[in-house]
Amino acid sequence: MEERVFLRKKRGESMHHVVMKLLSYLLYYRSGLAIEVGVGGHYKPDVVAMNARGEPVLWIDCGTTGVDKLGRLVERYPEATVVIVKQREGALRRYRQSAISTLGEEALTSVVWVAVGRDLVEWLCRRLSGRHSLEVTVPDGATAVYLTLDGESGRGEVMRVGL
């Protein structure tokens, strides 16, 4: 399958955040998946998939997400899977524990916790600017993602926490 994706780093946005959005898009790819599209509420997801009624069924937030925001998301969109993506497994585990302590584990049953390998994020940050050709392989049940960027190969770990 071939698809074109256009990403632009916004003022004040880190390149790491842009790369994490790209990796999240690649990990969760499905038809209709979109990056930075509003869904009509106060918050805007980094990556989202909608159902036929225009409601989020997949909401991905990368980087910093307040625990209060997470609570509002799972309450407002109970049918959606909410994916929290961070660069470091340790940071993800601490955030998850904070969310459980604040919101309760039962409120977070629709949340998936993912850490993408920092090495892959750094590798992409050093190489991405302008247009590129990117080939991606994400095996089912991925614990890694394999990339070829303009002919150069890269690989990164994917860790899912608390499943």
Where are these regions (language model features)?
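Non-catalytic C-terminal interaction segments of nucleic acid-processing enzymes
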Residues: 108-163
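Short, charged/polar "capping" segments at the starts of alpha-helices
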Residues: 89-95
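Terminal alpha-helical anchor/extension segments at protein ends
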Residues: 41-43, 50
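Conserved catalytic cores of phosphodiester-cleaving nucleases, focusing on short active-site segments
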Residues: 47-49, 56-69, 73, 82
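Acidic-basic catalytic patches of nuclease active cores, encompassing PD-(D/E)XK
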Residues: 1-39
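Cysteine-centric segments in proteins
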Residues: 26-27, 87, 114
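Hydrophobic beta-strand segments of well-ordered beta-sheets in folded domains
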Residues: 78-85, 108-112
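A short acidic, amphipathic alpha-helical/loop segment
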Residues: 69-76, 95-98
